Amino acid sequence: MKKLRYIIIAFLSLGLFSCSDYLEHNFNDQMTIEEVFSKRPTTERFLAGLYGYIPEEINAYDQSFVPCADDAYFSWEKMDYELVNSGSYNQSTTGVRGEWTPKFNPWSKYYVAINQATTFIAHIDECKELTGEEREVMKAEARFLRAYYYFNLFKQYGPIYLWYDQIADLAIKSEVIDRNTVDECVGFIEKEMYDAAQILPKTIQDPTTWMGRMTKGAALGMRSRVLLFAARPLFNGGGSIGYGRGMVNHEGKPIFPQGEDLNKWTKAAEAAKMVIDLDVYKLHFNKTETDPVLKAMNSYREVFTEKWNEELIIARYY
């Protein structure tokens, strides 16, 4: 018994020493932000990291409620999916709130992504190994991604706080941060997407280096969705129940529109027409099969099995 006690003490001591060594990091071998943006490879890797925050929309745990709404998942064995299907998903059943969401947690994830995108935009011009055109395109990618992540927050939480081009202040107190209004959020998001679209390429010329990266159609297509989202009654006067009309910020300013603006529907339609007028996207048809029945079958199958086709505007590989 005494021997066993000594063995246990010895192992615990080794564990303590290991933890001590593990926690003693040497930060001298880590790159500064200036060093990151001094080289092409590290600058490109920083941009690639921004793409890493794009949600997996097939995964309900990555802020996608689509799998919860049908039989994509067997909801009986997935408690949170069943809550959505039964209409019982709310704060009291899941503990959902802004800074801590056990299952659907985009809050901290997207604000980290937003801050990293702003950092990229602020420093990309320091990389002289990239041409001026390359820097402008990469900056447009980051600008679109930042707006897209703001939109994902807006979809779940409504009006949120906008940092604009300011890098996040870690010392700022939460009580001094106030929500922007719905119109301010939508106006910023859609303008950022529109501005990015003016620079991004219309089509993917080199699939080996550009596949999966954002294009003009991606930016305009997502902008169209943003404006359509903002035109719906929930964010456009609150419908017959006046949803959100009583919500104000700390200054007493209403954060939801107080009445319906029909022009928002017109703006959403015009945004969708801009995507159509690109003349890039169309229904996919199999190009090799001659039998009409097999051609129809293969055309439908290839929409899901081919890595890229004419119907895809934004895609993420799995």
Regions found by a protein language model. Name each.
Residues 44-62, 80-157, 172-211:
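Conserved, well-structured interaction surfaces
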Residues 154-155, 161, 229-238:
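Short coil/turn linking the two alpha-helices of tandem helical-hairpin repeats
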Residues 19-68:
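Membrane-proximal, proline-rich intrinsically disordered regions
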